[in-house]
């Protein structure tokens, strides 16, 4: 190697490294001279000569342990660089951008009049590593502009489903659990299709405020009614069904979305209670209108019985009743005041929750609650409201029982955790499997639908560690979950093909 080449290779701009570079240049020049004339070594004292030989030998051919350590360090550097580049591409996708926002922003389905779709056309990216598609399970390298875990074909299809609508003008839909997350997004989608919507939730006033805050609320707010209902109280569910049968002219769609996966103690809900207990007349007029059908009978009961209102008129209050010992162990250290998550729900800092429980750790109370909410209440609603659904002659009605793959029997990877929620979803699936044929004969198409992997249900600390150490991110968001549970209705109306008696995952039938 010539001095010119050496200078070029050692020409680094870092001035702090200049002394080291000078030593390296001198060492390189010495070795080059000795290579030309080895007799020069004989001029050195023997101990210096041996020292030089040992240093050159160790540098050129280190021992096995040092060599292995150097190779592993180099591999780690290469892997870290590749991971950094891959994460940069994945972090640029739309789904991760939405997830980083302090508050989840509902996508604007209807673009403004001056919107230029060509100018805003997002670009796909390429990954240096092979990725695994969440839907079709195939390997891919082209990263969709929105999804970080789908191949281009699956991503394009799923992205189109997020904003797909149908004309449901004049139709009436019942949606349980429509206050937050998937239920809330499903509610917005139904309202934007033109349907009249009845929403149930334990916290009707909080729910009303959320819907009223939407930019296009004035376009559909008059078609929305919100009822307070705690699905754990079966007489309340029965009373609610009787009220709908006696007051509604028709019912076209039922979406049984309300469920309990992770049980929360009373302190989780405390921050909403002031609003739920406040006098209705102090609330804005647009919110009062959403609650009239619920608040008027509630007011009559309160007036007749004083403070001892029936459970069906005090859904929010039931959330504050401690039922197990853990319900008394809350506090600001577990549920810090004022700290809300991306869905504007209370942050839960417990180190362990229902998602981590083994069978012998599940309380009888939680076991019964999960069955009542996830299986018994949908059974009652579907049964008691069938006459109302048959009141009009159309044969394109739908019942969606929102389920999960945890309720599948034909699933290879079944964990030992949360057996009680698995049982409830399996029971819900069996109801669909059994009753769908009967209901289809009356023009009512019943299906179970998996929402997809939208949320990491683990405690906050464990979920954060999985993201940092395993690079884990849920492959879908709540808009995807809503699109999935409403697809039997929207796709059926748009195509005229109404599926029934199926367990649907990723918009297609799957094993029970």
Spans of features found by a protein language model:
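Amphipathic alpha-helical dimer-interface segment in Rossmann-like NAD(P)H-dependent oxidoreductases
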Residues: 64, 74-75, 81-111, 137-141, ...
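A glycine-rich helix->loop->beta "capping" turn
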Residues: 124, 221-225, 243-256, 268
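Canonical Rossmann dinucleotide-binding motif of NAD(H)/NADP(H)-dependent dehydrogenases/reductases
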Residues: 159-204
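Conserved glycine-rich Rossmann-like NAD(P)H-binding loop of the short-chain dehydrogenase/reductase
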Residues: 193-211, 225, 253-258, 263-291
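Conserved Rossmann-fold SDR core element
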Residues: 223, 250, 436-451, 496-503
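Catalytic Tyr-X3-Lys loop
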Residues: 270-379
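C-terminal helical subdomain
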Residues: 299-337, 465-512
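Active-site helix of classical SDR
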Residues: 382, 420, 424
């Amino acid at each position: 190697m010539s001095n010119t080449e050496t200078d070029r290779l050692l020409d680094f701009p870092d001035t702090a490294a200049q002394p080291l570079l000078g030593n390296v240049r001198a060492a390189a020049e010495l070795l080059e001279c000795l290579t030309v004339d080895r007799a020069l070594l004989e001029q050195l004292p023997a101990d210096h000569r041996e020292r030089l030989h040992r240093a050159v030998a160790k540098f050129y051919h280190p021992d096995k342990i040092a060599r292995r350590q150097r190779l592993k360090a180099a591999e780690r550097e290469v892997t870290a660089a590749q991971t950094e580049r891959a994460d940069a591409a994945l972090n640029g996708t739309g789904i991760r951008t939405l997830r980083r926002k302090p508050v989840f922003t509902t996508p604007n389905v209807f673009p403004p009049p001056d919107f230029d779709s060509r100018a805003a056309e997002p670009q796909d990216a390429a990954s240096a590593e092979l990725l695994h598609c969440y839907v079709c399970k195939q390997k891919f390298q082209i990263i969709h502009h929105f999804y970080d875990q789908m191949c281009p074909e699956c991503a394009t299809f799923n992205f189109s489903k997020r904003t797909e609508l149908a004309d449901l003008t004049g139709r009436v839909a019942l949606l349980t659990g429509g206050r937050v997350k998937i239920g809330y997004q499903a509610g917005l989608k139904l309202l934007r299709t033109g349907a009249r919507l009845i929403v149930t939730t334990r916290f009707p006033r909080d729910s009303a405020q959320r819907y009223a805050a939407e930019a296009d609320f004035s376009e559909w707010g008059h078609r929305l009614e919100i009822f307070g209902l705690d699905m754990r109280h079966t007489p309340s569910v029965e009373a609610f069904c009787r009220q709908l049968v006696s007051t509604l002219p028709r019912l076209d769609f039922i979406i049984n979305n309300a469920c309990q996966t992770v049980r929360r103690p009373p302190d989780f809900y405390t921050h909403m209670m002031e609003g739920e207990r406040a006098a209705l007349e102090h609330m804005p007029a647009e919110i009062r209108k959403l609650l009239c059908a619920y608040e008027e009978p509630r007011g009559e009961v309160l007036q007749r019985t004083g403070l001892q209102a029936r459970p069906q008129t005090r859904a929010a209050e039931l959330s504050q009743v401690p039922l197990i010992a853990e319900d008394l162990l809350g506090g600001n250290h577990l549920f810090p005041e004022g700290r809300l998550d991306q869905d504007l729900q209370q942050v839960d800092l417990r180190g362990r929750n229902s998602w981590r429980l083994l069978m012998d750790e599940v309380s009888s109370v939680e076991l019964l609650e999960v069955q009542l909410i996830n299986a018994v209440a949908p059974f009652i609603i579907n049964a008691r409201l069938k006459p109302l659904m048959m009141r009009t002659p159309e044969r394109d009605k739908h019942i969606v029982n929102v389920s999960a793959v945890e309720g599948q029997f034909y699933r290879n990877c079944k964990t030992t955790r949360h057996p009680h929620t698995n049982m409830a979803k399996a029971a819900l699936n069996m109801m669909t499997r059994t009753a769908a044929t009967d209901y289809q004969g009356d023009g009512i198409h019943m299906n179970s639908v998996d929402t997809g992997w939208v949320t990491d249900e683990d405690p906050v600390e464990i979920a954060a560690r999985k993201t940092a150490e395993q690079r884990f991110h849920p492959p879908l968001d709540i808009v995807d979950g809503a699109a999935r549970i409403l697809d039997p209705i929207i796709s059926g109306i748009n195509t005229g093909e109404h599926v029934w008696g199926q367990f649907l995952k990723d918009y297609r039938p799957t094993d029970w």
